[in-house]
């Protein structure tokens, strides 16, 4: 299967529950010592429709040990999302480890290297549902000590540090809102 399914689909076991819907158990990836949230997340997917590639994002905080600020990035495109804020990241390529994809995407988008912390998960799973039927894995991270500061590239209009208490006032992409709320909750425990 191609079109974003590839290796991703080959690793899934389908369990048909109706003639038109499968419940697919997406395997947890090996994240080289990173804490995962759950072993599987169940996602309804129409039969014959390839699963889209997963997406990864970083909730970049000023400090993993004592977070007070988050790097919020406003989208440059597409036009309907322009100016709305998101957590930076991107697609996992075929056969790519999600943690490696996250490091690659942040280097491409923001020119920074990260120290990756704990995964931020939805209740009962490890992948967040987002736009276009995709799913997203999110990790807390901080800028690595040997890295330059993140800066907005072609994908973003701006990248700015925002106090955790002020994040709700930003115009977030709708799919990122529950994720940002979970990030704030995990940072303020």
PLM segments and residue spans:
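Conserved N-terminal beta-strand and adjoining loop/helix that marks the start
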Residues: 40-71, 91, 122
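Short linear motifs in low-complexity or flexible loops
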Residues: 15-25
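Nudix hydrolase/Nudix homology domain
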Residues: 30, 82, 138, 143-189
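Residue-level detector of structural "landmarks"
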Residues: 9-15
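Active-site-adjacent beta-strand/loop module that shapes the phosphate/pyrophosphate-binding cleft
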Residues: 53-54, 113, 118-149, 160, ...
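Conserved Nudix-box catalytic region and its N-terminal flanking loop in Nudix hydrolases
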Residues: 66-108, 112
């Amino acid at each position: 299967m191609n079109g974003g399914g590839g290796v991703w689909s080959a690793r899934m076991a389908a369990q048909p529950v109706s003639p038109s819907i499968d419940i697919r158990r997406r395997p947890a990836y090996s994240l080289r010592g990173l804490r995962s949230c759950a072993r599987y997340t169940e996602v309804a997917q129409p039969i014959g429709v390839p699963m889209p590639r997963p997406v990864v994002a970083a909730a970049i905080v000023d400090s993993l040990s004592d977070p007070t600020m988050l790097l919020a990035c406003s989208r440059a495109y597409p036009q309907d999302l322009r100016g709305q804020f998101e957590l930076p990241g991107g697609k996992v390529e075929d056969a790519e480890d999600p943690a490696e994809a996250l490091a690659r995407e942040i280097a491409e988008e923001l020119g920074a290297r990260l120290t990756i912390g704990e995964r931020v998960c939805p209740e009962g799973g490890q992948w967040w549902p987002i736009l276009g039927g995709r799913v997203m894995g999110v990790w807390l991270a901080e800028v690595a000590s040997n890295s330059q500061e993140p800066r907005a590239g072609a994908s973003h209009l701006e990248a700015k540090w925002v106090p955790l208490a002020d994040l709700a006032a930003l115009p977030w992409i709708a799919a990122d809102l529950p994720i940002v709320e979970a990030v704030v909750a995990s940072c303020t425990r």
